[in-house]
Amino acid sequence: GVPCLCDSDGPSVHGNTLSGTIWLAGCPSGWHNCKAHGPTIGWCCKK
């Protein structure tokens, strides 16, 4: 999947590990939404 920036990763994508994965239809079972605001499309989820 496409990596995304979780709230716990830091304020910006520069120099931070992107620990989330974008899911277009919501987070699958066993995953949770790790970003409070965004992304614009889909959800940023992590295990």
UniProtKB/Swiss-Prot annotation:
GO molecular function annotations of the record: sodium channel regulator activity; toxin activity
InterPro entries found in the cross-reference section: Anenome_toxin, Myo_ane_neurotoxin_sf
Keyword Nucleotide-binding attributed: no
Keywords from the UniProt entry: Cardiotoxin, Disulfide bond, Ion channel impairing toxin, Nematocyst, Neurotoxin, Secreted, Toxin, Voltage-gated sodium channel impairing toxin
Record GO cellular component, one term: extracellular region
A Gene Ontology biological process term: regulation of signal transduction
Domain of life: Eukaryota
Function recorded in the entry: Binds specifically to voltage-gated sodium channels (Nav), thereby delaying their inactivation during signal transduction. Has a longer mammalian heart stimulation effect than Hk2a, Hk8a and Hk16a.
Protein name: Delta-actitoxin-Aspp1b
